[in-house]
């Protein structure tokens, strides 16, 4: 199946880690990708209020979630966690979304932007930027999750 890039959609990208969630977004023409401050991940999902606020303020129309697959494209334990979080966001936001293989996005961010051993969350948001740039280059359409079936 051939995918085409969505038209006039501003997208939020999430790099979901165990401690923080990196955020980045693009304009509706996919010309610029900007980072947002990373969020501390809370057990009660309190960070969701901030995500929802960014979506409203920036008029974002969909989101992508990075899945850290292994080097053979298989799901890792962290990928399962990211998938669950993405599905939770979909159920709360009701926005189109897609998963993106983010294998090595942190490594690429460290090398490309020269940020190493970062505890502030900057590397997480830079990784979200890399994931979004990758998604824009690959050109997939956002999909809506209906029940357990992705269409």
Swiss-Prot record:
What Pfam families does UniProt report for this protein, alphabetically? RuvX
* Gene3D superfamilies, A to Z: YqgF/RNase H-like domain
**Is Membrane one of the keywords?**
no
Sample GO molecular function, one term: nuclease activity
Keyword Kinase listed? The answer is no
| Biological classification of the source | Bacteria, Bacillati, Cyanobacteriota, Cyanophyceae, Synechococcales
Q: What is this protein called?
A: Putative pre-16S rRNA nuclease
The family note in this entry says:
Belongs to the YqgF nuclease family.
One GO-annotated biological process of the protein: rRNA 5'-end processing
Classify the main location.
Answer: cytoplasm
- Supply the NCBIfam families for this chain: RNAse_H_YqgF (TIGR00250)
Q: Enumerate the HAMAP family for this protein.
A: Nuclease_YqgF
As for what it does, the entry says: Could be a nuclease involved in processing of the 5'-end of pre-16S rRNA.
**A single GO CC term, please?**
cytosol
């Amino acid at each position: 199946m051939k995918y085409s890039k969505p038209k006039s959609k501003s997208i939020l990208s999430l790099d979901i880690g165990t401690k923080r969630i990196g955020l980045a977004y693009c304009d509706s023409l996919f010309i610029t990708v900007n980072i947002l401050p990373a969020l501390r991940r809370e057990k009660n999902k309190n960070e969701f209020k901030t995500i929802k606020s960014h979506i409203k303020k920036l008029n974002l129309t969909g989101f992508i979630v990075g899945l850290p697959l292994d080097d053979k494209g298989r799901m890792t334990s962290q990928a399962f966690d990211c998938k669950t979080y993405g599905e939770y966001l979909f159920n709360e936001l009701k926005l189109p979304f897609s998963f993106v293989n983010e294998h090595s996005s942190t490594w690429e961010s460290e090398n490309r932007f020269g940020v190493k051993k970062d505890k502030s969350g900057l590397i997480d948001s830079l990784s979200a930027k890399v994931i979004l740039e990758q998604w824009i280059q690959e050109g997939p359409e956002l999909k809506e999750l209906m029940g357990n079936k992705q269409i």
